[in-house]
């Protein structure tokens, strides 16, 4: 987000324009990511685009786009990470692993836990490819090695900072969003409603953090 808004500020673009372009870019990235993923399975356009729009315009995405858009980055990167994993296995090259690493560097610096969760999908596909023999094991492991190497290199800048923070910094999460607080709102019913994110329910002595949440 920093480079994005710095660039538009340097160009003299009003903040509200840069913000709305940012929102539009996030929605486009989410929708096009799902479309890219589903096309790898050779699904017809009649199936691809409704699914892509449903993912990009889900209640969760729309609810937090205007207030906590950075939280959505791992979810936006999920279809791209899965699709690029599939392509890395099917096509032996450095191109798709490099794109995978760029996506990780873009969406992973905000929340490592969320990145780990979305990383389960590519991992499961690797296991599926090995079990189903979609490709020779050597090619699959080679793709994993290329992805791991490049993703580590492109993420070193924020992994280093995170390591320093974890070692010498204050345990801020204990006071701001403990596991108990986060889990309390993530019930099955709320998740089905497209909600469940703890910040949506929070407030202080002055007001709710997200005022429209009261009616829900």
Provide a role label for each language-model segment.
Residues 1, 148-216:
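Periplasmic/ER-lumenal interhelical loops and adjacent helix-loop junctions
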Residues 1-15, 107, 204:
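Short hydrophobic/aromatic helix or loop-helix immediately within or flanking a transmembrane segment
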Residues 9-13, 90-94, 208:
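Conserved helix-loop functional segments at active or binding sites
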Residues 13-17, 43, 109, 139:
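Juxtamembrane loop-transmembrane helix junctions in multi-pass integral membrane proteins
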Residues 16, 41, 66-67, 142, ...:
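Extracellular/oxidizing-compartment recognition motifs
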Residues 25-41, 46-131, 143-162, 168:
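Membrane-embedded helix bundles of polyisoprenyl
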Residues 133-141:
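Membrane-interfacial, low-structure loops and terminal tails that flank and connect transmembrane helices
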